Amino acid sequence: MIHTDYIRLNRILAALTFFISFFVYYDTMASTVSYWDCGEFIATSYTLGVPHPPGSPFFLLLGRIFSLIPINQDIAFRVNLLSPLSSALAVMLLYLVVVKVVTHWRGKIENSTDAMIAFGGAVVGALAFAFTDSHWFNAVEAEVYAISTFFTAIVVWLILLWSEKADESGHERYILIIAYMMGLATGLHLLNLLALPFIALIMYFRKYSFEWKSFLATVGITGVTFFIIHNMIIKGLPKMAASGLGIGGTAVIVVAVFASTYWAIINKHNLLSVALTSMVMILIGYSTYTTIFVRSNQNPNIDENDPETVEAFVSYLEREQYGSVGTFPRRYKGIEPIHEVVGRPEKGRDFSPRQEREYMFYNTSKQWDYFWNYQIKKMYN
């Protein structure tokens, strides 16, 4: 909590962190098309085309809006502007998050010393994050990561705001807007789902005292929630439509969820109504993915994978074109392969699962050396 004498100062400093980071990002922003996926995202935003799987449809809609703002002749410049703005907002939200964490730890801000510690620490922390290599890099080009970071930041801030007001009437509204934000974020990048454990732990420690039984139950519920969102909504609904259920059967299931939510609200089943309404909000946010299906049927100039049928759309969401590679064994140089994969055991008797396991864990220390020296130190320094 913040004493009323310092609320205005808190708002000024929050705005200051936003403007400082925004002006730096704007000044260093790519003035036109840059490398990697940026050109693709700019072109598909401007034309509402279909980019590479899994699509990022919400980014395309926002990019389309920014492409219509008459501030520069270069369309790429207009779409690029989305990243500095969302990145600066993420920095501002980080400032507000740090203030809430510090005040929760130290207590209410009542004098200048409290204000200096909370506000000063938040400014330093937010600006330190603002100028980290990864965030700054994402903030100056048309990519999904900048706005995905913003959505993660706003979800974290909202759950901390809920924690302050959890004993007040109507606190459920914060949970519902978090669910909606997470639904929208699925149309950007699935990174936002990683905030689920944090949200669950904040809710748990705000409402309960620590006990292993209740803590493990919370962890289990969090896992089930993640499974429902990722496997049953994001990936499951399109698969249902592609299966025997068809689009009509899938629509019936969605309508049933809405009807169940209405029933729970009318009959004042508070916990059930919040859970079902949260699911509805996620579904509404996730509905941005219908734009991929709709636009592909219009055959835009950029129509990657042509996901205009339900089956093709499922393949598009599943990223099937990329294939799959296991995490182990790690790819590194320095030793000779100790076996050659010759196919399934019944076709090649010289290969067995035991050999695969031995190869996977062969010289583990050298695998970790490669991971640390190349994939961490070289890529991030």
Describe the role of every protein-language-model region.
Residues 134-145:
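Short acidic/glycine- and proline-prone juxtamembrane loop motifs at membrane-interface regions
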Residues 15, 81-110, 153-158:
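Transmembrane-helix motifs of polytopic, lipid-linked glycan transferases
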